[in-house]
Structures are given as C-alpha cells and as structure tokens.
C-alpha cells in the first residue's frame, strides 16, 4: 500500500453510518455544534477521530497498525429538535482503546482532547454506554445500597443527613457539639462540608476525634447507629489515605471524598481502601456544575454519575429537584435510576440515550441536598423513594429552637410522610396537609414549619430536555 501524505477529510475514514456496533464497544452520544460551514458528518467524524486514533493529517505509522480495528466510528447522526445547528452524534469506541479499571483513562480518551477542536463551536458528552465487559474490570462502590442498610440496620425509609454549618470557621470542639446535637435529635448522618479539609481553624485530626466522640454519645443515647461523613479529601493521595486510616481506627462507619476536585485516580484508590476496611464512602460532587451546567458544552452529570459508580462511592449528591440547586425532574430521576438500578432501559424522555446493564455492580444512594426544608419532605419522599439520603443543612441548623429540635422536626416530618405513603395517601397532592397534621403533635416541627413557610427558590432549570 503506497503511503499518501496530506490532509484527508475525517468523514472519509471515521463516518460509517452503516457500521454495526459491537456489544463490547463503549458508545458515546455527543451534542455537537459545528462551526458555520462544517457539515455534521465531518464534525461527527472529527469527534470520533480526535477521541480515538486520528490526527489532523495522514501519518506514515498508520500503516503499522490496523486502524479498522482501533478507530472510533461515528455511526449515527440526528438533528436536535428545536435547535438549528446542533446534532447528536453517536460514536462507538473499540474496547481495546481503554485501560481496564481506569475511569481516568476512559475520560482522557473520550473527552481529553477533542473539546478544544477548532471545527466545533461547542461539544457536550451527553451519555455513555459502558459495556459489561468493561464494567467487570471495576470494583465499583465499596459496599452499595443493601450492604449499607444492613450495616446501619435502617430499612423502609430514606436516610436523613445534615451538613454542619457554618461550613468554615468553627473550632473542632464546637463542630463536634453541633454534630452531637443533630444526631441526638434523630438524624442518621451529619456531614463535613466539601471544603472542610484541614484548615488552620480546625485541623482534620481534631475534627475526626470530636466527631467520633459526638457520634458514639448520640448512638448511646438513641440506640440507633449514627454516622458523620469525615471528609478525607486532601492535597495528596497519601494524605487522603492517612486520614481514611485514622477514621477506620476510630471505628466510625463512613468517610467522604470530593471526587471531581480530588480526581478519579484518588477516588478509586479510596474506594478500594473503603471496601477492604469496611468503611462506607460518601461522595460530594464539588465542581460538577463547571463541567455539566451549560446545555451545549461540557459533560452531562449523568456521565459523571456513571463514572462515579465505576470508580466507587456509596452515596453521591444528585440534586434535589425542589431546592436551591439545578435539576429538572425527569433528567434527575433518569440519572438517579442509573445510580441505583441494575438495568436501565434507553429512555430519551429522561435523557437516557442508551440501555445500560450494570451486571450487578453495587448501586449508589443518591443524596438530595441544598436549600431543602420540612415543607419539601413530601415531595422529596415521593421523588426519591426509600433508597436515598435527604440532607438538610440550613434546614436543620436554622430551626429557631436549635440544632436538636431542628433534627427532631426533620425526623418527624419524614416519618409522617413515610407513614402516609404506606397508608396509600398521595404525597404530591396532600403533602402540606400531612406536614400540618404532624406539626400539631410536634412543637419542634410546628416551629420549623413557621420559619420556612414562604421560602422557595423559583428559577427555571438551565439544563432541560430537548422538546419538539
């Protein structure tokens, strides 16, 4: 074969509309906005090329390998309804392009380079189909939903959490005191804020000690198992593991990590440590909106959520639908199912582009957190169901009577909603009535209801489904 130098159009090699995808391929759905004058086939093929074997010109060394075996292929393109110049381009990647058990390598390949590509005005990775053959190379969540329930001995209801506020500035002793009050009042978990690591006003070791003391005291008083998400996120992997080891030595049930700022390599290491040592792992998604909030550019959160399930985590923040942070209901429920269920059918009405089979990888519990309070409890119980953690930071610590009564109010509201649901009542229609009835016999709940009766965060979601 004679080598022919020069710049060839990408679509000649990488746009193959008739190609059949393999069961072992990783499939990607990209939302592509080409520059004016660039046809969608060329743009789609360019994405496939630049995220797999291609480069800008033909190279001599192409002859030393089998491009047909290794190249990504753009196998289908569809216009986005309601958008003049946007297309969904589907790309299939051969499995051999990826290192086993490495989310880091998967992302470096698929989204590493191509997003700066000049022929594209914008590019967003909307969804990935991870084949069972690749999933089986990952450990996944350290324990998963069922094992967590068994460890905590809590069934048949969502779990309750609270982020300790003010997030920065408390001393370790006062921080521990707030933890104790919330847990004693009836919460299951309290949480380090994502930016609490080890700062001058509160070093990590002191915080770990006082929080452990708080949760043992609360356990003894309530007869329930309690947890505090001790944030092990640190500047180096070694320091992170050191903190996790200390948490294990204290005998606490759960640690926490910021998986996007900490990075997938660190996160996967921590997840392996947690499984080997019986620690649950709570994952915070700090920095996600930088990546996922723009509708036409970046990576959709459902992809970051899938990646986390592969890398490993037992809880992950997944939006509230009703609070202060972004999240359209159908889209949120789509990736909540991707986190929890074993098999998820393709469903474009919920933003799910591919059928995903997790082949028994443990599930992740979605965490609803951010601007929620007792009046939201019926909606949250209905939307998220039992396998979830509902986190009320300000909604606990902002109760007028203090932290413990704030916790009592949340627990009473939750138990009332679960009871009503189990009796067959419609939480969506009767939610306010259910909360009002419960507040008649719980003065703590009545006080909380009074404070937050008018609070709403009324903004339209930025990231919406495409509709005709």
From Swiss-Prot:
<protein>
    <recommendedName>
        <fullName>Ribulose bisphosphate carboxylase large chain</fullName>
        <ecNumber>4.1.1.39</ecNumber>
    </recommendedName>
</protein>
<keyword id="KW-0602">Photosynthesis</keyword>
<dbReference type="GO" id="GO:0009507">
    <property type="term" value="C:chloroplast"/>
</dbReference>
<keyword id="KW-0503">Monooxygenase</keyword>
<keyword id="KW-0150">Chloroplast</keyword>
<feature type="binding site">
    <location>
        <position position="317"/>
    </location>
    <ligand>
        <name>substrate</name>
    </ligand>
</feature>
<dbReference type="InterPro" id="IPR033966">
    <property type="entry name" value="RuBisCO"/>
</dbReference>
<keyword id="KW-0456">Lyase</keyword>
<dbReference type="InterPro" id="IPR020878">
    <property type="entry name" value="RuBisCo_large_chain_AS"/>
</dbReference>
<feature type="active site" description="Proton acceptor">
    <location>
        <position position="284"/>
    </location>
</feature>
<feature type="binding site">
    <location>
        <position position="193"/>
    </location>
    <ligand>
        <name>Mg(2+)</name>
    </ligand>
</feature>
<feature type="active site" description="Proton acceptor">
    <location>
        <position position="165"/>
    </location>
</feature>
<keyword id="KW-0479">Metal-binding</keyword>
<feature type="site" description="Transition state stabilizer">
    <location>
        <position position="324"/>
    </location>
</feature>
<dbReference type="InterPro" id="IPR020888">
    <property type="entry name" value="RuBisCO_lsuI"/>
</dbReference>
<feature type="binding site" description="in homodimeric partner">
    <location>
        <position position="113"/>
    </location>
    <ligand>
        <name>substrate</name>
    </ligand>
</feature>
<dbReference type="InterPro" id="IPR036422">
    <property type="entry name" value="RuBisCO_lsu_N_sf"/>
</dbReference>
<feature type="modified residue" description="N6,N6,N6-trimethyllysine">
    <location>
        <position position="4"/>
    </location>
</feature>
<comment type="similarity">
    <text>Belongs to the RuBisCO large chain family. Type I subfamily.</text>
</comment>
<dbReference type="InterPro" id="IPR036376">
    <property type="entry name" value="RuBisCO_lsu_C_sf"/>
</dbReference>
<feature type="binding site" description="via carbamate group">
    <location>
        <position position="191"/>
    </location>
    <ligand>
        <name>Mg(2+)</name>
    </ligand>
</feature>
<keyword id="KW-0601">Photorespiration</keyword>
<comment type="subunit">
    <text>Heterohexadecamer of 8 large chains and 8 small chains; disulfide-linked. The disulfide link is formed within the large subunit homodimers.</text>
</comment>
<dbReference type="InterPro" id="IPR000685">
    <property type="entry name" value="RuBisCO_lsu_C"/>
</dbReference>
<keyword id="KW-0460">Magnesium</keyword>
<keyword id="KW-0488">Methylation</keyword>
<keyword id="KW-0560">Oxidoreductase</keyword>
<dbReference type="Pfam" id="PF00016">
    <property type="entry name" value="RuBisCO_large"/>
</dbReference>
<dbReference type="GO" id="GO:0004497">
    <property type="term" value="F:monooxygenase activity"/>
</dbReference>
<comment type="function">
    <text>RuBisCO catalyzes two reactions: the carboxylation of D-ribulose 1,5-bisphosphate, the primary event in carbon dioxide fixation, as well as the oxidative fragmentation of the pentose substrate in the photorespiration process. Both reactions occur simultaneously and in competition at the same active site.</text>
</comment>
<dbReference type="GO" id="GO:0016984">
    <property type="term" value="F:ribulose-bisphosphate carboxylase activity"/>
</dbReference>
<dbReference type="GO" id="GO:0009853">
    <property type="term" value="P:photorespiration"/>
</dbReference>
<dbReference type="InterPro" id="IPR017443">
    <property type="entry name" value="RuBisCO_lsu_fd_N"/>
</dbReference>
<feature type="binding site">
    <location>
        <position position="369"/>
    </location>
    <ligand>
        <name>substrate</name>
    </ligand>
</feature>
<dbReference type="GO" id="GO:0019253">
    <property type="term" value="P:reductive pentose-phosphate cycle"/>
</dbReference>
<dbReference type="GO" id="GO:0000287">
    <property type="term" value="F:magnesium ion binding"/>
</dbReference>
<feature type="binding site">
    <location>
        <position position="167"/>
    </location>
    <ligand>
        <name>substrate</name>
    </ligand>
</feature>
<keyword id="KW-1015">Disulfide bond</keyword>
<keyword id="KW-0113">Calvin cycle</keyword>
<feature type="binding site">
    <location>
        <position position="285"/>
    </location>
    <ligand>
        <name>substrate</name>
    </ligand>
</feature>
<feature type="modified residue" description="N6-carboxylysine">
    <location>
        <position position="191"/>
    </location>
</feature>
<feature type="binding site">
    <location>
        <position position="194"/>
    </location>
    <ligand>
        <name>Mg(2+)</name>
    </ligand>
</feature>
């Amino acid at each position: 074969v004679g080598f022919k130098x020069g710049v060839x159009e990408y679509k000649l090699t990488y746009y193959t509309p008739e190609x059949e995808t393999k069961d072992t391929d990783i499939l990607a759905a990209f939302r592509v906005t080409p520059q004016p004058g660039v046809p969608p086939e060329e743009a789609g093929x360019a994405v496939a090329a630049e995220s797999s074997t291609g480069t800008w010109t033909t190279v001599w060394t192409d002859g030393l390998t089998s491009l047909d075996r290794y190249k990504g292929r753009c196998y289908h393109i569809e216009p986005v309804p309601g958008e003049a110049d946007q297309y969904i381009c589907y790309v299939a990647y051969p499995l051999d392009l990826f290192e086993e058990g490495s989310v880091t390598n998967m992302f470096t390949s698929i989204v590493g380079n191509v997003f700066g590509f000049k022929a594209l005005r914008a590019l967003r990775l909307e969804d990935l189909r991870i084949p069972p053959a690749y999933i089986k190379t990952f450990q996944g969540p350290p324990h998963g939903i069922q094992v967590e329930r068994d460890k905590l001995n809590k069934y048949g209801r969502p779990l309750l959490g609270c982020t300790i506020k003010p997030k920065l500035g408390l001393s370790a002793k006062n921080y521990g005191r707030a933890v104790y009050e919330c847990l004693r009042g009836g919460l299951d978990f309290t949480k380090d804020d994502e930016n609490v690591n080890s700062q001058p006003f509160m070093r990590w070791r002191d915080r770990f000690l006082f929080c452990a003391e708080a949760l043992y005291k609360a356990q003894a008083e309530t007869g329930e198992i309690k947890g505090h998400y001790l944030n092990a996120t640190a500047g180096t992997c070694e320091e992170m593991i050191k903190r996790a080891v200390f948490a294990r030595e204290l005998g606490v049930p759960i640690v926490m990590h910021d998986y996007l700022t900490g990075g997938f390599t660190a996160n996967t290491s921590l997840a392996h440590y947690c499984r080997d040592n019986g620690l649950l792992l709570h994952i915070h998604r700090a920095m996600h909106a930088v990546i996922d909030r723009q509708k036409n550019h970046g990576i959709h959160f459902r992809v970051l959520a899938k990646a986390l399930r592969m890398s490993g985590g037992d809880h992950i923040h997944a939006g509230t639908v009703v609070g202060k942070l972004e999240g359209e209901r159908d889209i949120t429920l789509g990736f909540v199912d991707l986190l929890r269920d074993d098999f998820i059918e393709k469903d474009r009405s919920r933003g799910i582009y591919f059928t995903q089979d997790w082949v028994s990888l443990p599930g992740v519990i979605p965490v609803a957190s951010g601007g929620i309070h007792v009046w939201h409890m019926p909606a949250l119980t209905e939307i998220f169901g039992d396998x979830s953690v509902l986190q009320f930071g300000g909604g606990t610590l902002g109760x007028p009577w203090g932290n413990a009564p704030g916790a009592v109010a949340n627990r009473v509201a939750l138990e009332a909603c679960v009871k009503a649901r189990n009796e067959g009542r419609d939480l969506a229609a009767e939610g306010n009535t259910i909360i009002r009835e419960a507040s008649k016999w719980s003065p703590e709940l009545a006080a909380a209801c009074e404070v937050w009766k008018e609070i709403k965060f009324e903004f339209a979601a930025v990231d919406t489904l495409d509709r005709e």
